[in-house]
Amino acid sequence: MTIAIGKSSEEPKGIFDTMDDWLRRDRFVFVGWSGLLLFPCAYFSLGGWLTGTTFVTSWYTHGLASSYLEGCNFLTAAVSTPANSMAHSLLLLWGPEAQGDFTRWCQLGGLWTFIALHGAFALIGFMLRQFELARSVQLRPYNAIAFSGPISVFVSVFLIYPLGQSGWFFAPSFGVAAIFRFILFFQGFHNWTLNPFHMMGVAGVLGAALLCAIHGATVENTLFEDGDGANTFRAFNPTQSEETYSMVTANRFWSQIFGIAFSNKRWLHFFMLFVPVTGLWMSAIGVVGLALNLRAYDFVSQEIRASEDPEFETFYTKNILLNEGIRAWMAAQDQPHENLVFPEEVLPRGNAL
């Protein structure tokens, strides 16, 4: 038996290679280079939200109770946006507003900017994670591309929209009821439901739900019965080489139902990707438009006729009056610092009243 003693021919690894080996090692929870962005940002944003909804009041920013400590529940608690007077300040803890005082920072709404910015980078980190893993296992990057839809909506609603307005104050607060209030605000001040980009977004999301239901049902309906298991989940070997369901039978079924059907699996699944992602992108584009105060559809001729003819009213003119009511009530309540007072005679009345 011969033993060779000598120097290894392998060169010592540099710091980058050492980090790369550790970060991309196969483990239960993959870390990766993207994890350096994802995990800290996700931890801080989620931790900030849990802290804010548990302990922090919105009395100084909105005149509201918004924490569990004040008696709110899961649906009514929120981390509210900074006060309108803070404009677009990043509200850094060490900045001129809070001056290192954590309590003051929370009172001014610093947790909102903390959560929004860390949340945005966490979402971007999650998309990069999908890119990184796809590259590692030699997949195409469509998962990451699809996730750009939710990212675009988050960034447009929580960051770009308030940047186009007078301050972070007009962004949504992080809470269930707070988001509902923001939706009413969007309708009243921007007539959002009549915006074509919102219509495309609704068509994309609901259309995707329909496609998902149809696709799942069709696959279940056309499974090959070649297994001996008791149910769908046990009848097939996960490493089987043959097709699990009959595309030919599915095509024949839907051809009879609609007169047209997908005959290509690749086109079918690309379409299921395309519909929701495009819908989300269109919604995000629409919100960017609202940041610039672009108008939705206006049917002024109907409004003029409704104002002149007491017997003429359409669903559109009724909605316009409803929007005026939302603005009249919401502006005074949401912006008490403006001291808005609307006399009774200027509040909107429909022709029916």
From Swiss-Prot:
Keywords, ordered alphabetically: Acetylation, Chlorophyll, Chloroplast, Chromophore, Electron transport, Iron, Magnesium, Membrane, Metal-binding, Oxidoreductase, Phosphoprotein, Photosynthesis, Photosystem II, Plastid, Thylakoid, Transmembrane, Transmembrane helix, Transport
Positions annotated to bind a plastoquinone: H215, F262
GO-annotated biological processes: photosynthetic electron transport in photosystem II
Regions that span the bilayer: 41-61, 125-141, 153-166, 208-228, 279-295
UniProt catalytic activity: 2 a plastoquinone + 4 hnu + 2 H2O = 2 a plastoquinol + O2
Chief location bin: plastid
A molecular-function term among this protein's GO annotations: electron transporter, transferring electrons within the cyclic electron transport pathway of photosynthesis activity
Binding-site residues, chlorophyll a ChlzD2: H118
Membrane protein topology class: Multi-pass membrane protein
Annotated residues for binding of pheophytin a: Q130, N143
InterPro entries assigned: D1/D2, Photo_II_D1/D2_sf, Photo_RC_L/M, Photo_RC_L/M_CS, PSII_PsbD/D2
Localization of this protein: Plastid, Chloroplast thylakoid membrane
Record-level GO cellular component terms: chloroplast thylakoid membrane; photosystem II
Cofactor binding annotation: The D1/D2 heterodimer binds P680, chlorophylls that are the primary electron donor of PSII, and subsequent electron acceptors. It shares a non-heme iron and each subunit binds pheophytin, quinone, additional chlorophylls, carotenoids and lipids. There is also a Cl(-1) ion associated with D1 and D2, which is required for oxygen evolution. The PSII complex binds additional chlorophylls, carotenoids and specific lipids.
Gene3D superfamilies in the cross-refs: Photosystem II protein D1-like
Domain of life: Eukaryota
Residue positions binding Fe cation: H215, H269
Residues found modified as Phosphothreonine: T2
Task performed by this protein: Photosystem II (PSII) is a light-driven water:plastoquinone oxidoreductase that uses light energy to abstract electrons from H(2)O, generating O(2) and a proton gradient subsequently used for ATP formation. It consists of a core antenna complex that captures photons, and an electron transfer chain that converts photonic excitation into a charge separation. The D1/D2 (PsbA/PsbD) reaction center heterodimer binds P680, the primary electron donor of PSII as well as several subsequent electron acceptors. D2 is needed for assembly of a stable PSII complex.
Family statement: Belongs to the reaction center PufL/M/PsbA/D family.
Note: 2 of the reaction center chlorophylls (ChlD1 and ChlD2) are entirely coordinated by water.
UniProt name for this protein: Photosystem II D2 protein
Species this protein is from: Chara vulgaris (Common stonewort)
